[in-house]
């Protein structure tokens, strides 16, 4: 008869110590760490200023990890949607794998933004300019460019089709001595004192090196760990299976995966 003994979970204090070690290795390219960095609106604003090459860009509102609904089809949780002072909207996505940054996913994100930005009865021409920005770990498009701008054109004339929809791919492997390259370096940097941007460095230092920031990160990791248990991801009849599942969850947390991604792993 199979042993159905359930392995006792490690204590909260033990997990917090493990979390603290993992937090040291987080970068802004990690999903969990990114959304905590971007809770400081100045960080979102700086990233957009560099990518858009606009020092005058001012973020006046943003939402993080919001579930954008499609009542007739698939919804999606968007990492960050920011609004600037000129009523432009920017969806910033950090993508560690190429399959999370496919052209058709970018197209779908554009559609979700449109569906959620146009109120009933409003004219179509009141749709704002939208920018879907994928910051990718690898060269997702394969053009060996630091940044690729995608916009519809009229084939016969090469004129831009003025629908107000823009897609940008930013290749974070390109870390040359330009403002964009230095930003990409910072997104991959684990240590605040080695970052170029004072804005990003201050926020990373706060989250990694202050008691308040570390506790905030530990609490979030614990919430994700508990969500994993509640979803059944960590349940197993064999103690060995349960131990392996817990180790897997902690490893996925270290990679910066969200609760939703861990549940699907």
Task: State what each model feature region is.
Residues 1-163, 176, 231:
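Accessory alpha/beta interaction modules
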Residues 154-163, 171-173, 183, 187-190:
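Low-complexity, glycine/alanine/valine/leucine- and proline-rich hydrophobic stretches
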Residues 134, 169-171:
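Short, well-ordered beta-strand micro-motif
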Residues 2-24, 28, 32, 90-95, ...:
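Short, charged alpha-helical interaction segments and adjacent helix-coil junctions
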